[in-house]
């Protein structure tokens, strides 16, 4: 065949990819606080000393909704074989009480706004007198902040610029991960990933394909 040794290039697709790459690099190089939370430059609002206080604690209960708990649940389920701690997740009002409920727990109550109705309700349902409690919420007047003050509990600041769905590599996901005995810096790998050309090219190709499908109303 005459075309056997001819390589065809889709210049339209190449131009799209180039424009997308420029936008990607612009976002990466910009001082974006959410992007920063994916890197090892991010500074947690809790200390290693704080984590060590709970080193001998075996039972944890995570109370929250949606993005406040899903990331932590994913980490726990994926790495369960390496984790020697017991974590229970309360993420709706229908959650059945576990057979271990007679044990003492350290509760992690998570809500950015501090006013999520289900989280506030479950906090009142599950917190017992002998439990230790850690609240992750914004440092402002809200229902969980008031409850934490009333119980004289630990309060970890939830940065207001990170929404629930983007929060897994912030305090919301990394504090529970460190309480599991995992290392937060092992998760924040954006610094090294953006230096990997294969990763960046695959990412851009996937994003470009997704955008095209959305424009064509196929997804």
Describe the residue ranges of each PLM region.
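Glycine-rich phosphate/diphosphate-binding loops that line cofactor/substrate pockets in enzymes
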Residues: 47-58, 99-104, 207-217
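Extended, charge-enriched "interface" segments that sit outside catalytic cores
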Residues: 1-46, 51
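Glycine-rich phosphate-binding loops that contact phosphosugars or nucleotide phosphates
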Residues: 55-197
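Generic structural motif recognizing short loop/turn segments at the entrances and edges of beta-strands
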Residues: 2-4, 31-34, 84-86, 151-152, ...
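Acidic catalytic cores of enzymes that act on phosphate-bearing nucleotides/polynucleotides
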Residues: 40-41, 50, 182-188, 196-219
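Low-complexity, compositionally biased segments
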Residues: 10-13, 94-95, 209, 215
């Amino acid at each position: 065949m005459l075309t056997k040794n001819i390589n065809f290039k889709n210049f339209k697709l190449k131009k799209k990819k180039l424009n997308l790459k420029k936008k990607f690099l612009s976002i990466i190089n910009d001082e974006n606080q959410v992007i920063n939370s994916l890197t090892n430059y991010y500074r947690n609002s809790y200390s290693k000393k704080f984590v060590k206080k709970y080193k001998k604690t075996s039972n944890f209960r995570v109370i929250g909704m949606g993005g406040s708990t899903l990331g932590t649940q994913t980490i726990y389920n994926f790495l369960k074989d390496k984790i020697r701690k017991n974590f229970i997740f309360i993420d709706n009002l229908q959650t059945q009480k576990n057979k271990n409920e007679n044990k003492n727990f350290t509760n992690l109550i998570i809500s950015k706004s501090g006013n999520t109705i289900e989280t506030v309700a479950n906090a009142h349902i599950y917190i017992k007198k002998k439990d230790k409690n850690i609240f992750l919420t914004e440092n402002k007047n809200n229902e969980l902040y008031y409850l934490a003050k009333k119980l004289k509990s630990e309060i970890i600041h939830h940065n207001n610029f990170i929404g629930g769905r983007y929060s897994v590599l912030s305090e919301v996901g990394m504090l529970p991960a460190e309480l599991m005995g995992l290392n937060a810096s092992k998760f924040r790998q954006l610094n090294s990933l953006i230096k990997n050309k294969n990763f960046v090219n695959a990412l851009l190709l996937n994003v470009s394909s997704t955008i095209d499908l959305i424009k064509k109303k196929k997804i």
